[in-house]
Structures are given as structure tokens and as C-alpha cells.
């Protein structure tokens, strides 16, 4: 699958304000500072499509991007990161509700990509989030990020730890990919996966609906 264009569409404060289009949505989420924006930029081939920041927890809203290929149109959705402890309890609860409402209520959500920093050993909050999504029947994929920042042995050990732990909860393990925004590792594999679960959707129809929603 080759991406022709990728553009910012809109920002939504909650799922009820999300654009009413027929475009399938592929949402990306992870702990704060996991490299989510960098991964989205790498996938789309647009360096500044999703705003990156050295400060964790900068994404506070639901960001929608329209992606067009030669035959299909879909949306990439950048969700706020979870697990940023420096927020007030009220802000944390607001973000948790925003994230949960989108994941559980958004009919256009086709797949949830959960990002994991491959440099780190398994984090409890990531495991709990993956299992929560699985328990609610959400189609999901695990994406290990920052593969260029760690040696092969450490990378393989961390992935093995994850697969072993998940097998305690999952009868069938979710798909997983290893990526690097710096080297574009995993880009082709991720795009091929998205293409494989993305049925033919009219580019014209999706774009027209998105524009009508903006008007």
C-alpha cells in the first residue's frame, strides 16, 4: 500500500464531537512519551503531520488525520497517552473517560494500535490496558517502538517476556510489530497489515464526507 496524501482533519474533545464520516479509523495509543507522534509521521511519510514533543503528555485531544492511498481512504487517530502521573486526578479521570469512550463507542474504529517502548521491561499499566481492551473485544495490535535504541538481545528478551505474560491471559496472542521511527523499521509491515484489514472504501466518498462535516 502506497500513501499518496496524509492531512490533518480535526481535533475532538470527546467521541461525540468526532467527525461523522464513513472512513475506517485506525487509532494509536500508548503511555506518554512512547513515540506515538513520531510513529504516525513515519507511517504517513510526513515529518510534521502529528506534532512531536520532548515533553510527555502533550496530546490532550483526539486528533484525526485523513490518509489517501491509490485506492482507499481511511483515518489515523492519535489518542492521548495514558499513565502520565503529573496530571491532577481530575485531569487523569477526564482523559481516561475520553479514551474509554472513543475505544468502546466509536463505530468507525477498525483497529487499536497499542504502542510499547521496547527499551523497557514490561510495565503493569501497559499490560492492564491491553487486557482491558481485549476483554471488551477491541481489535488490537501491539506495536513495539524505538527498536533502534536497544540491542537485538535486549529487544528479543523484552518481546519474549511480553508474549509469555500475555499467553497467561490470551488464548490467541494479538499481532505484534517491531518498529523504529528513526530507521522506518516496520513501516512496510504495518502498512501491509492495515491494508489487509481495510476493505475497499471510496476515496471520494470519505473525503467528501469529511469536508461536509467541516462545513
State what each model feature region is:
Residues 1-86, 203-215:
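Conserved G1/Walker A P-loop phosphate-binding module
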Residues 3-16, 150-207:
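Canonical P-loop GTPase G-domain recognition
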Amino acid at each position: 500500500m502506497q500513501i499518496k496524501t496524509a492531512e490533518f482533519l480535526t481535533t475532538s474533545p470527546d467521541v461525540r464531537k468526532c467527525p461523522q464520516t464513513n472512513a475506517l479509523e485506525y487509532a494509536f495509543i500508548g503511555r506518554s512519551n512512547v513515540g506515538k507522534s513520531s510513529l504516525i509521521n513515519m507511517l504517513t511519510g510526513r515529518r510534521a503531520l502529528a506534532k512531536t514533543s520532548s515533553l510527555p503528555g502533550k496530546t490532550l485531544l483526539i486528533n484525526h488525520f485523513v490518509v489517501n492511498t491509490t485506492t482507499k481512504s481511511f483515518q489515523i487517530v492519535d489518542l492521548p497517552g495514558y499513565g502520565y502521573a503529573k496530571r491532577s486526578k481530575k485531569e487523569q479521570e477526564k482523559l481516561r473517560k475520553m479514551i474509554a469512550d472513543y475505544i468502546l463507542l466509536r463505530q468507525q474504529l477498525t483497529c487499536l494500535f497499542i504502542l510499547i517502548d521496547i527499551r523497557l521491561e514490561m510495565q503493569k499499566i501497559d499490560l492492564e490496558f491491553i487486557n482491558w481492551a481485549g476483554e471488551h473485544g477491541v481489535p488490537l495490535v501491539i506495536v513495539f517502538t524505538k527498536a533502534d535504541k536497544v540491542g537485538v538481545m535486549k529487544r528479543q528478551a523484552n518481546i519474549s517476556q511480553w508474549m509469555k505474560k500475555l499467553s497467561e491471559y490470551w488464548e490467541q496472542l494479538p499481532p505484534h510489530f517491531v518498529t523504529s521511527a528513526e530507521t522506518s523499521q516496520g513501516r512496510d509491515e504495518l502498512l501491509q497489515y492495515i491494508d489487509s484489514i481495510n476493505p475497499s472504501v471510496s476515496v471520494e466518498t470519505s473525503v467528501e464526507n469529511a469536508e461536509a462535516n467541516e462545513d
